[in-house]
Amino acid sequence: MEELSQALASSFSVSQDLNSTAAPHPRLSQYKSKYSSLEQSERRRRLLELQKSKRLDYVNHARRLAEDDWTGMESEEENKKDDEEMDIDTVKKLPKHYANQLMLSEWLIDVPSDLGQEWIVVVCPVGKRALIVASRGSTSAYTKSGYCVNRFSSLLPGGNRRNSTAKDYTILDCIYNEVNQTYYVLDVMCWRGHPFYDCQTDFRFYWMHSKLPEEEGLGEKTKLNPFKFVGLKNFPCTPESLCDVLSMDFPFEVDGLLFYHKQTHYSPGSTPLVGWLRPYMVSDVLGVAVPAGPLTTKPDYAGHQLQQIMEHKKSQKEGMKEKLTHKASENGHYELEHLSTPKLKGSSHSPDHPGCLMEN
């Protein structure tokens, strides 16, 4: 590990000119062509083809999540244990059924050629990802690792005793912002017992923004609804639209941008069909002229963050994923598959280096 740290340290230049945050990252174009372009674009193409033939039983999957009923699943898991190369202690500590249910992003390194036509962007607040399950008169919030961190009543269908029936259950992908006591709704996987996993992104978003306002009082904080539920808006990914978005004022502290392919289904786990960028990266990565403002101002760690992304991606290509993932978990430098901002350990600029806000 000591040798690895030295090797990584030696690959970072501390020259003020070379790593100036006012200029594009010096190795960005080289990295994009060599390590990510074919890989990420090819994986996108294959996943879009695969989902046409892949039809999972999401009706039962949603019902199991809503009712916490996993009868018959234990025998299947027992058969898989011999094939899993995981540490036994880790398996015991992690929850089984509610873990890894969220669709997570990758850094958007390879710019899609159809970005303006086939992609949608969502501006995300600072917060933590949460799987929300409203069923049987109660609402539960789970982390991406499957831990239940809160149970409360809500005005979501199935979320409180007044509006709960056996078929009324709802499953949402949210970002919880503690400052505003709000669950910002990213996506919908199930609404009133109807699963939407196999629906395209543009339809899921349309449904979400049509149905959320119909639930009176859902966006207000009350005794029956102690946390607000607010749908996050989505925008086209044309250069003009991105410029408009980056000029807007939002009622929350912005963490970053999620880019969704319009045709992608909701698939739990990390996918190249959902990309993630910090707002200041848009000009360098997408080549879009952006307006000057709070969202596009590059922080002091901008050059270092791009360097971390590229080194991590390169290491995966060279078969060093396991070592660097362990290194990342120790130093908190990487949260590449989740929405976050890296914090440089021991940095003297701690106020300017927010921690991993989206997911710790």
Swiss-Prot record:
Bias type Polar residues, positions: 7-22
Residues the UniProt record annotates as site (Interaction with m3G-cap structure): S105, K144, W276
Gene3D superfamilies: DNA ligase/mRNA capping enzyme
Compartments in which it is found: Nucleus; Cytoplasm
Ranges for region Necessary for interaction with XPO1: 1-159
Region Interaction with m3G-cap structure, residue ranges: 127-129
Outcome (variant: R27A): Abolishes interaction with KPNB1 and m3G-cap U1 snRNP import receptor activity
Necessary for interaction with KPNB1 and m3G-cap U1 and U5 snRNP import receptor activity: region residues: 1-65
Location of the IBB domain: 11-73
Role noted for this protein: Functions as an U snRNP-specific nuclear import adapter. Involved in the trimethylguanosine (m3G)-cap-dependent nuclear import of U snRNPs. Binds specifically to the terminal m3G-cap U snRNAs.
UniProt name for this protein: Snurportin-1
Organism this protein belongs to: Homo sapiens (Human)
Gene of this entry: SNUPN
